[in-house]
């Protein structure tokens, strides 16, 4: 022990009592420990040791596992022995104790420093013969290394008993040679040709792979002999001289069917077979070739492709195509002449791109659709003679993209791809091009996500280019709970798209260049009753929402019809610059509703009876565009028909703002508007609207605050009224009306209604900037009326009651003789005197006007 250390001392075990060689201020500053090279135990006073005297302690525990007893002083730097306070007596003894505590702390710190690894006079760290423990493995070349690190490194070296060994020759002299020793010196020698050493040297070269025995093609592997269970066979390439489709095969016991890709059965073998060692099924494993745009040799790969698909299904492996994902502009694909069935497959990685020629294609038939031949089917459900078994759809599939193209471009009737699946995720797109029939059909499917669906040159008068709907069956199972990002139908013929999925969402629909050749497509009541008898786009689905919808047909084509079914359906926007629109009722009880944002239509709109609609705005851009509504619940925020010959015919609902050339309304509330020619039948309420001409022929029509007619008005019907309105032209009254707070800048003519038992006309707070011309049966009630002249002609029956009225001109009319007793209140003018008279119970009395 270094004698310069004063506060730490260690004794060998063996005794029980040990001296304390240093002074201390308190026993709690003395620590007694049992120590060894790799362990230390701090003992407790009284229970594990005790003081024999002030300078001696006695151990009370065994020392097994330890070889030393350590006694050290550890004076507290925070717990003061002497605590000074203001006003206390300062004694020398207290000062000495306080100074001594500080001295002890400094002395102990010096001893700890002396126990640490210090620099010697040369600047090197001196461990003073002690071990350095808990050292990490070295990283840099100059780092210290542990014994374990060094020992492990030596275990991987070639060791000799001699103290020194000469270095190996340069690597340039050792290439292709094996190591040998001559005279104690390492040398390189060439192995004997054909020897095991020679083989090992050759195999160790970069080119050694070429020396390993292997099958040169899948067909060559079938002729292998001498194989035993457990052997591994290396296949260079699927085809002789090729570079793809190779791999390793394990020889297994048993019988199997050779599938031409993953299972190989040697010729004549019945008890062994070779199975490819892999965790996926690649198209190249089966020698499946692709072609560019279908212009190559067109080798039919349908058999190989179906084998690969079947292997992926049975082994539950992903099918890897190795074809980059493409949309409908397909360039490279696998040519097939027979339809393929991917039912039950779980994963397709890469784009499954198929090229077909419908003139040669032997398509697959799906249950319930005997006349449609499909290039690809995916039928994850149970079926019977009628079609699908309700509620049986499964799936849980994952696809990158599936693209099918008819290289003959509608060369013969055919169909692209049909999916019946549930819980499926498509990462890319489902696309079809060039089919005279369905392109992409998703029927009886649920709970799936598809970012993109596209068809080009698909559809006909009987089948939809894209069809998302129910699968046929005794109880049709409708598609529902689908999330579809985008649907695009380009260059469709007649039927472009039907989307009838329930409780689903479609983010965007883009229809372009549709060619409509027929208007005879009414194969269902949904279409037959839509007002047009045909539809090229059909959007429906209980509780389904659509984002933006756009349809732009071929110029010169028969105007296509876009039909939207009010089945609690939501559409953000409809842009149909050259299309007609049908807003149709749903065959549900109670009737559903359509909620739409903005609708822009270049053609006409028909709203069928029972179609409950709530629409933010409708704009009709055609010169003679016409909206015809048979629904009593057509509710529109803004309805604008901008054409000079545009018209609106509606039987009910609410319109926030109506702008059109001509409107014929029944049961409609219009809050504001601008109309050239307005005809009101029954039960209309019009306010804050300007009409250039007005014709009222029905009953219970109410012209309210802010209504204005800038031209002539013909007012017929009964139980009609006008209040707080302006007639800027002449008014022809055909039937009794009630006017309150009305300004008429023209003559008012009332001819009376000889067929009506009630023929009252009421003027209250009315200003007629013209003449009031009365003829025929009438009963006039005027209160606070102003007019220029009142002319009465051939009034055979009736009366006139006037109160607070002003005639700036005068009253003139036929003379009523005593032999012609009129009803009480009748009024006339004595042409001889010019004094107007009114008939009372006392006879004719002069009439005084205020």
UniProtKB/Swiss-Prot annotation:
Keyword Calcium listed: no
GO CC aspect terms: virus tail
Subcellular localization(s) per the UniProt record: Virion
A biological process from GO: adhesion receptor-mediated virion attachment to host cell
Pfam families: Phage_T7_tail
Main subcellular localisation: virion
Keyword vocabulary terms for this entry: Degradation of host capsule during virus entry, Degradation of host cell envelope components during virus entry, Host-virus interaction, Viral attachment to host adhesion receptor, Viral attachment to host cell, Viral tail protein, Virion, Virus entry into host cell
Domain topic, free-text comment: The N-terminus anchors the RBP to the virion. The central part and C-terminus probably binds and degrades the host exopolysaccharides.
Role: Functions as a receptor binding protein (RBP) and probably mediates the attachment to the host capsular exopolysaccharides. Displays a depolymerase activity that specifically degrades the KN4-type polysaccharides of Klebsiella pneumoniae capsule, which allows the phage to reach the host cell membrane and bind the entry receptor.
Subunit structure: Homotrimer.
Entry's family note: In the N-terminal section; belongs to the Teseptimavirus fiber family.
UniProt name for this protein: Depolymerase, capsule KN4-specific
Organism, as annotated: Klebsiella phage KN4-1 (Bacteriophage KN4-1)
């Amino acid at each position: 022990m270094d004698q310069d250390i004063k506060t730490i001392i260690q004794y060998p075990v063996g005794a029980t009592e040990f001296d304390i060689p240093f002074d201390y201020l308190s026993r709690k500053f003395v620590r007694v420990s049992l120590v060894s090279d790799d362990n230390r135990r701090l003992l407790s006073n009284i229970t594990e040791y005790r003081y024999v005297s002030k300078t001696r302690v006695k151990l009370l525990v065994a020392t097994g596992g330890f070889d030393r007893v350590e006694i050290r002083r550890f004076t507290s730097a925070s717990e003061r022995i002497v605590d000074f306070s203001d006003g206390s007596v300062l004694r020398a003894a207290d000062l000495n104790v306080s100074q001594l505590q500080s001295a002890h702390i400094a002395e102990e710190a010096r001893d700890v420093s002396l126990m640490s690894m210090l620099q010697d006079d040369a600047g090197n760290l001196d461990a003073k013969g002690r071990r350095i423990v808990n050292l990490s493995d070295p990283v840099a070349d100059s780092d210290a290394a542990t014994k374990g690190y060094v020992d492990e490194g030596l275990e991987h070296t070639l060791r000799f008993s001699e103290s020194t060994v000469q270095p190996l020759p340069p690597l340039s002299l050792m290439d292709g040679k094996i190591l040998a020793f001559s005279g104690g010196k390492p040398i390189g020698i060439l192995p004997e040709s054909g020897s095991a050493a020679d083989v090992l040297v050759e195999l160790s070269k970069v080119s050694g792979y070429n020396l390993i025995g292997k099958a040169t093609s899948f067909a060559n592997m079938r002729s292998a002999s001498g194989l035993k269970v457990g052997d591994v066979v290396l296949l260079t390439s699927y085809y002789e001289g090729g570079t793809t489709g190779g791999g390793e095969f394990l020889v297994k016991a048993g019988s199997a069917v050779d599938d031409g890709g993953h299972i190989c059965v040697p010729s004549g073998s019945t008890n062994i077979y070779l199975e490819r060692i892999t965790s996926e099924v690649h198209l190249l494993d089966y020698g499946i070739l692709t072609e560019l745009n279908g212009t190559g040799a067109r080798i039919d790969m349908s058999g190989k492709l179906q084998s690969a698909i079947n292997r992926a299904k049975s082994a539950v492996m992903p099918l890897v195509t190795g074809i980059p994902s493409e949309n409908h502009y397909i360039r490279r694909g696998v040519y097939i002449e027979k339809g393929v069935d991917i039912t039950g497959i779980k994963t397709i990685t890469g784009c499954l791109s198929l090229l077909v020629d419908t003139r040669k294609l032997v398509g697959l038939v799906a249950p319930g659709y005997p006349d449609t031949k499909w290039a690809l089917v995916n039928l994850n459900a149970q079926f019977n003679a009628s079609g699908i078994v309700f509620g049986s759809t499964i799936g849980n599939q994952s696809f990158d993209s599936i693209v099918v193209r008819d290289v003959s471009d509608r060369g013969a009737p055919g169909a692209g791809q049909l999916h019946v699946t549930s819980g499926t995720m498509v990462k890319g797109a489902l696309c079809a091009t060039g089919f005279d029939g369905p392109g992409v059909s998703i029927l009886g499917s649920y709970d799936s996500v598809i970012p993109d669906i596209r068809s080009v040159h698909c559809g006909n008068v009987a089948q939809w280019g894209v069809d998302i709907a129910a699968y046929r069956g005794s109880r049709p199972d409708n598609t529902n709970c689908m999330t579809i990002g985008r649907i695009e139908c380009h260059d469709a013929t007649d039927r472009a798209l039907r989307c009838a999925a329930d409780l689903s969402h479609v983010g965007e629909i883009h229809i372009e260049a549709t060619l409509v050749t027929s208007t005879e497509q009414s194969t269902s009541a949904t279409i037959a009753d839509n007002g047009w008898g045909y539809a090229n786009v059909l959007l429906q689905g209980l509780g389904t929402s659509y984002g933006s919808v756009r349809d732009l047909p071929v110029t010169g084509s028969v105007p296509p019809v876009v039909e939207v079914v009010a089945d609690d359906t939501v559409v953000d926007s409809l842009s149909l610059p050259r299309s007609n629109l049908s807003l149709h009722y749903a065959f549900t009880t109670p009737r559903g509703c359509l909620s739409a944002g903005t609708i822009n239509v270049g053609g006409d709109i028909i709203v069928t009876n029972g179609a409950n609609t709530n629409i933010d705005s409708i704009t009709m851009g055609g010169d003679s565009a016409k909206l015809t509504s048979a629904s009593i619940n057509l509710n529109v925020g803004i309805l604008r028909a901008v054409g000079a010959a545009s018209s609106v015919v509606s039987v009910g609902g609410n319109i926030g703002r109506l702008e059109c050339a001509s409107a014929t309304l029944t049961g409609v509330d219009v809050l504001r508007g601008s109309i050239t020619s307005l005809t009101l039948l029954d039960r209309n309420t019009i306010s804050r609207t300007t009409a250039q001409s007005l014709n009222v022929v029905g009953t219970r029509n109410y012209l309210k605050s802010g209504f204005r007619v800038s031209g002539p008005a013909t007012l017929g019907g009964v139980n009609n009224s006008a209040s707080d309105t302006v007639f800027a032209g002449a008014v022809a009254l055909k039937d009794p009306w009630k006017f309150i707070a009305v300004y008429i800048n023209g003559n008012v003519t009332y001819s009376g209604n000889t067929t009506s038992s009630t023929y009252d006309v009421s003027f209250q707070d009315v200003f007629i900037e013209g003449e009031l011309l009365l003829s025929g049966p009438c009963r006039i009630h005027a209160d606070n009326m102003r007019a220029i002249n009142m002319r009465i002609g051939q009034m055979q029956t009736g009366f006139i009651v006037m109160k607070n009225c002003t005639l700036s001109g005068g009253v003139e009319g036929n003379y009523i003789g005593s032999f012609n007793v009129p009803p009480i209140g009748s009024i006339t003018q004595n042409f001889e005197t010019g004094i107007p008279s009114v008939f009372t119970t006392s006879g004719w009395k002069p009439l005084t006007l205020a």
